[in-house]
From Swiss-Prot:
Residues 106-216 form the EamA domain. It is a multi-pass membrane protein. This is Probable sugar phosphate/phosphate translocator At1g06470. The keyword Isomerase does not apply. It comes from Arabidopsis thaliana (Mouse-ear cress). InterPro entries: Sugar_P_trans_dom, TPT_transporter. Keywords: Membrane, Sugar transport, Transmembrane, Transmembrane helix, Transport. Belongs to the TPT transporter family. TPT (TC 2.A.7.9) subfamily.
Amino acid sequence: MEQRVQLRVGTMETISNEGDVDREQVLETFGIENETGKETNGSRSFDVGYSSGDTLETLPKASKVDISPADVLKTLFFILVWYTFSTFLTLYNKTLLGDDLGKFPAPLLMNTIHFSIQAVLSKMITWYWSGRFQPDVTISWRDYFVRVVPTALGTAMDINLSNESLVFISVTFATMCKSAAPIFLLLFAFAFRLESPSLKLFGIISVISAGVLLTVAKETEFEFWGFVFVMLAAVMSGFRWCMTQVLLQKETFGLKNPFIFMSCVAPVMAIATGLLSLLLDPWSEFRDNKYFDSGAHFARTCFLMLFGGALAFCMVLTEYVLVSVTSAVTVTIAGVVKEAVTIVVAVFYFHDEFTWLKGVGLMIIMVGVSLFNWYKYDKLQKGHKTEEEKQLQAPSQTGKYVILDEMDDQENSP
């Protein structure tokens, strides 16, 4: 009897004989079915058939699936849109929060309003187009509190700490320090078993770390608390993007759509930040502050908050779309390039100091991230071969998964 094994492609995940999962970048599982030519959840699929009399050498040779130019252009478009919204949002935050600029007295209140706008807009969109955005599965309460809530809290802390750091330090200095996010993303990826530690990755981490240290060295306007806040934000950034990738790309959670995901995390972010605002923001000083001391000023403040919330909604939505169609690693790599763009804009807009030492540090960071990008691309092209992947399931047993590139290598070997 001929068995047919259907593999869903576009993602990469293998299951070892011991049941451990070796995740490349994404966590979607392969599907085994007895049908052919079926579209599964919008993913392309193809069949590799073998009969009980086939040996490894007689298995049909699989062809590689290349990334289409349309996919590349779509990704580049979303990255460009993300750059635009992010740059404007950074300028907005610094202009409003800077100690020597707008000096808005309540950064946490501002973020609470922004998160609330994101929650309301995403809920309205998923409700109005409920037929389109209705998830196939409903996330369990256990997964909600164990996975969604920590992701939301990590995202809220990332944004709150980043904005708080802008009160004390320049956009250029904050951006360079925040460029350390890939280091923490890798560390969390190791912890969550999304990546396997290797000498190459530790070397890349060392290069990026050296670049960050050079940007901090001889900083003429060094503010300790600003530095602490922005580095904690980098830690939270690594955590939240690892968790975001898990939630967006694992089908069992039913959060693959960015609008559904945002409608789940944004309310938690708004509530948590609102509680912090009640505790930490100087509410007693609002009446005498230039943002709230008259009706006209209060109306202007409301408009500023709504404008910032719309910018934040568009930027975060673009981030989630990028992660859902690519990976957290892609977003982080594109994010570091975005930081370079932000630095250039800040130097011209805010006249931030940019020394040759900072320039060298920035170049080293870019080299480190480029090396990481090359490492991931090379790994995806060649396939990460392990001993478990090299063992082929006997035909009489229930189906195991076989990496197609590895089948090519074994087929061509003596």
